[in-house]
Amino acid sequence: VLPATADTRTFVTKSIPLNIPLLSSAMDTVTEARMAIAMAQAGGMGILHRNLSLEEQQQQVRRVKRFESGIVYNPVTLSPTQTLADAKALQTKYRVTGFPVVDEKGRLLGIVTNRDMRFASADETPVSKMMTGKNLAVLREPADLAEAKSMMHARRIEKLLVVDQQNKLTGLLTIKDIEQSVLNPDACKDTKGRLRVGAASTVGDNGFERSEQLIDAGVDLLVIDTAHGHSGSVARAVERIKNASNYVQVVAGNVATAEATRALIDAGADAVKVGIGPGSICTTRIVAGVGVPQLTAINDCAEVGAKTGIPVIADGGIKFSGDFAKAIAAGASCAMIGSMLGGTDEAPGEVILYQGRSYKSFRGMGSVGAMAQGSADRYFQKEASAEKLVPEGIEGQVPYKGPAGTVLHQMIGGLRAAMGYTGCATIEDMRTNCNFVKISSAGLKESHVHDVQITRESPNYRVG
């Protein structure tokens, strides 16, 4: 098997495929809409953190779903009696540059674009005076992308309206979406051509309300995000969400034992997240004295998942692309990474200059700062005041890494190399056909760079 021919497609749940087996972690210094977009365009998926208000998290879900949409079904519209001020407000809210104009029955009347608004000076100018209503470029259902691209090129336009046989607006197509499809052929998309996105929620009534609202916003994957997934509250949360919606897929975690995996699968989880204490910023194993070494945990949990066809996700402990390959070889269907993506352009936060080098802040969701901001219930400390919190993580900084795409390229390149070395053509082969060899401390030392001083840093190998 040549690395270039290795097939990296996998499933995060039975019904959600990924083109690369990577998720970005639901951490407030890793994943917001910008990271989720980058992950989905690369073929993976981003999980939006929940240290956001419900409205902000919903807005970020919508932002990802609208970023690259194929045909935008039910686009934001204006009526002819609305004003320039209304159009500007919607433009700011939804980050779009044009609006179809429809009557009260949904029939298409025209379109208002950025160019139309630029030449209207008064905020009270009605939409009917600004819109282009004649000689509209319209595509009738069923829409064909090749025909749409040809029409856009011929008319020198960037937006195309899709209507049914009664001239009712059914969708909107933009040249940006067509171009993005060409630039990102491996993007992870839903059946409507929109980027896929996940979001973290929690347990209890507040968690259920958040989950319902995220489902309404169009989220593809809900992650019940707790530090201890083998608890009654997590199982009840999974059951409650699955009873409320057959559409949404639910990931539950975190766990580290076969028994815990079995309990969450019995509760209805579509995937189980594995990892207690392996993360670079996590102190659970030291503070609580609880945890299982990550490779052992993945192996034990994956054996249970394999019996029911439920995937497990390796969450934490991945420092190099080789660790990622080992997680897959141990039985994980995909891996969740945090510190690898912390410090990239798409991660939230500003670049900090420290001792001549650039860094970005990075913290665990069990750190004092993150818990005080809203993630305390992840560690079942919701009622504790700030000074009474018992943290299970730290706050720090990681080197600035540039675009997330560069990191993902190196990660997938390392995985492909591992698949080539082991003769595994697919991720399923990798999960089931690899053998592990015990290694001593001397063997580990030998595995790393030794007896030489590094003069030029490699993009996929950093020590310290």
Language-model-detected regions and their locations in the chain:
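Short beta-strand/loop segments at the ligand-binding rim of alpha/beta enzyme cores
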Residues: 19-24, 70-75, 190-200, 240-256, ...
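Catalytic cores of alpha/beta
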Residues: 35-36, 209-217, 256-274, 314, ...
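Catalytic beta/alpha-barrel core
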Residues: 49-51, 77-78, 98-100, 138-139, ...
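Glycine-rich phosphate-binding active-site loops on the catalytic face of alpha/beta enzymes
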Residues: 41-56, 219-231, 270-288, 318-352
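Bateman/CBS regulatory modules and CBS-like beta-alpha motifs in cytosolic regions of diverse proteins
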Residues: 2-18, 25-27, 56-96, 101-103, ...
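Alpha/beta catalytic cores of nucleotide-metabolism and tRNA/nucleoside-modifying enzymes
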Residues: 1, 78-79, 140, 150, ...
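Terminal amphipathic helices with adjacent charged low-complexity linkers/tails
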Residues: 50-64, 101, 105-121, 152, ...
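Active-site-adjacent beta->alpha loops and helix N-cap segments on the catalytic face
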Residues: 4, 54-62, 120-124, 144, ...
